[in-house]
């Protein structure tokens, strides 16, 4: 039995954009440029919602000068809850996904790094491969969703450097997905 997102009430209405790969003839890719995703959303009235996402460019994260445990970090649109029913344990997911330099952590990752300490409001630093630093304030702690399509430890909003990534569309029940 196929169990990924089996408890998601939106499961039957979520579609990933796939297109011909420019790198490999005859292959499909789920990479969509930021501009193409916006054009699809604006040109097809049947699209209820769009969710763009991509891994971040961070090499590692630090808290108070110490390197944190390895983490999968994803930047995404604020429409996450239109697609996936995440439950917030503490804080505001909306703030994490709409305010620059804010972030949400999974409950498991927060416990791994901070133990039982309430980490809402704490600041962590992202360090990319060039050594450039960017600070994020923790705005939310999310409960894990078993067998979720999305696998991550940290979430943040899409920033100005977003060029593209995976794009999901939410269509209404019964919509012609091939149109």
Predicted segments, located by residue:
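Active-site-flanking beta-strand signature of metal-NTP-handling nucleotidyl enzymes
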Residues: 15-18, 51, 166-169
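Small-residue-enriched segments and motifs
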Residues: 38, 45, 136-140
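Glycine-centered tight turns that cap/initiate beta-strands
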Residues: 45-49, 118
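Extracellular low-complexity Ser/Thr/Asn/Gly-rich intrinsically disordered segments
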Residues: 6-7, 11, 39, 48-51, ...
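Alpha-helical transmembrane segments
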Residues: 1-18
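Short acidic/polar micro-motifs at solvent-exposed secondary-structure junctions
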Residues: 19-30, 38, 52-79, 85-102, ...
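Mid-to-C-terminal secondary-structure elements
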Residues: 77-90, 101-179
């Amino acid at each position: 039995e196929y169990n990924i997102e089996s408890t998601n009430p939106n499961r039957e209405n979520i579609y990933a954009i796939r297109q011909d790969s420019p790198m490999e003839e005859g292959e499909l890719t789920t990479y969509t440029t930021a501009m193409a995703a916006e054009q699809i959303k604006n040109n097809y009235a049947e699209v209820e919602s769009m969710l763009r996402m991509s891994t971040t460019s961070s090499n590692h994260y630090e808290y108070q000068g110490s390197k944190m445990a390895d983490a999968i970090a994803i930047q995404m649109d604020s429409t996450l809850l239109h697609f996936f029913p995440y439950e917030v344990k503490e804080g505001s997911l909306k703030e994490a996904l709409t305010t620059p330099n804010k972030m949400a952590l999974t409950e498991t990752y927060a416990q791994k790094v901070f133990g039982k300490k309430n980490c809402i409001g704490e600041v962590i630093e992202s360090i990319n491969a060039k050594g450039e630093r960017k600070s994020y304030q923790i705005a939310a702690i999310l409960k894990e969703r078993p067998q979720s399509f999305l696998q991550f430890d940290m979430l943040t909003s899409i920033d100005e450097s977003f060029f593209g990534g995976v794009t999901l569309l939410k269509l209404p029940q019964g919509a012609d997905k091939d149109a």
